[in-house]
Amino acid sequence: MTDRNISLTYAGAGVDIDAGNRLVDLIKPMVRATARAGAEAEIGGFGGLFDLKAAGFADPVLVAANDGVGTKVKIAIETGIHDTIGIDLVAMSVNDLVVQGAEPLFFLDYFACGKLDPETAAAIVAGIAEGCREAGCALIGGETAEMPGLYKDGDYDLAGFAVGAAERGSLLPGRDIAAGDAVIGLASSGVHSNGYSLVRNIVEASGIALSAPAPFAPVATLGGALLTPTRLYVKSCLRAIRETGAVKGLAHITGGGFTDNIPRVLPEGLGVRIDLAGLTVLPVFKWLAQQGRVVEREMLRTFNCGIGMVAIVRRDAVQQVVDVLTQAGERVSLLGDVIVAGDEGRVVYDGQLDLAV
């Protein structure tokens, strides 16, 4: 029972305002480094500001997205590696913006924890700032919530919010997607940020410690390899859209894999035929499939399997688009074609994934 003669405090309840102020001081230079046309990227006010006119748009449509990184944060917590999970947070939202033809403009984050450690939180924000710089968007604000009793000490969760813009009339997917268009894939960097509940189950069943060498990448620890950041496709895809005029649609391959994500950008009545032999399956996916005895269908519905972004491209401009994407640093594969959807479903697979280790 609480002694009624004792004066209770917020700090005594587990919330340290001074730690929050120290965090703000630590991250101000990181945030400032994300400044871009339209935003000075200063924090400390009650709201973030963005000047849309200064960003150079004439008749813009705003596009918004928000996402998290799922249970990938648990691996960051267990390994103590916190400086890359913020990149994932940015990538998950801004990749969804570029799918609609939008240029990311600004980003806000939400960080919730049981007990605030300013240095850990600053490492996370450093990753967020790095992701924002790579995507060309400003980090204009965020929220840090210290919630003792809701989260255990050391645990945290993240959410991100991104806003972008596209000129009216240039939004994707285009209405001209048609049977015969080409389907190309942009390589992923790894598992990205989906499927980690299954990944963690497989790791636990394997008995391999996160600090041990990764069986599929011996130069890295298992935990470090699984924390490889989600690839950001923003600048390369925007370049392909603007320079070629031949990109009709984009699909960010997240939870649901090809099976659920590609149909989201296709007109009713159309599907795609994918040649699985055209996929370069990354070693991490081969290991997960073998170690977890995960069947091909489940792999394709859960993971990106080596392709993080799919583009629907005008057939006569495939090489032009591939050249632009390659020059922008992407590894590109020809995956298949847009087809008239039939009884087989909207995503038809030919061949098999190469899951042999």
From Swiss-Prot:
<keyword id="KW-0963">Cytoplasm</keyword>
<comment type="pathway">
    <text>Purine metabolism; IMP biosynthesis via de novo pathway; 5-amino-1-(5-phospho-D-ribosyl)imidazole from N(2)-formyl-N(1)-(5-phospho-D-ribosyl)glycinamide: step 2/2.</text>
</comment>
<dbReference type="InterPro" id="IPR004733">
    <property type="entry name" value="PurM_cligase"/>
</dbReference>
<protein>
    <recommendedName>
        <fullName>Phosphoribosylformylglycinamidine cyclo-ligase</fullName>
        <ecNumber>6.3.3.1</ecNumber>
    </recommendedName>
</protein>
<keyword id="KW-0067">ATP-binding</keyword>
<keyword id="KW-0547">Nucleotide-binding</keyword>
<keyword id="KW-0436">Ligase</keyword>
<dbReference type="GO" id="GO:0005524">
    <property type="term" value="F:ATP binding"/>
</dbReference>
<dbReference type="InterPro" id="IPR010918">
    <property type="entry name" value="PurM-like_C_dom"/>
</dbReference>
<dbReference type="InterPro" id="IPR036676">
    <property type="entry name" value="PurM-like_C_sf"/>
</dbReference>
<dbReference type="GO" id="GO:0006189">
    <property type="term" value="P:'de novo' IMP biosynthetic process"/>
</dbReference>
<keyword id="KW-0658">Purine biosynthesis</keyword>
<dbReference type="Pfam" id="PF00586">
    <property type="entry name" value="AIRS"/>
</dbReference>
<dbReference type="InterPro" id="IPR036921">
    <property type="entry name" value="PurM-like_N_sf"/>
</dbReference>
<dbReference type="GO" id="GO:0004641">
    <property type="term" value="F:phosphoribosylformylglycinamidine cyclo-ligase activity"/>
</dbReference>
<dbReference type="GO" id="GO:0046084">
    <property type="term" value="P:adenine biosynthetic process"/>
</dbReference>
<dbReference type="InterPro" id="IPR016188">
    <property type="entry name" value="PurM-like_N"/>
</dbReference>
<comment type="similarity">
    <text>Belongs to the AIR synthase family.</text>
</comment>
<dbReference type="Pfam" id="PF02769">
    <property type="entry name" value="AIRS_C"/>
</dbReference>
<dbReference type="GO" id="GO:0004637">
    <property type="term" value="F:phosphoribosylamine-glycine ligase activity"/>
</dbReference>
<dbReference type="GO" id="GO:0005829">
    <property type="term" value="C:cytosol"/>
</dbReference>
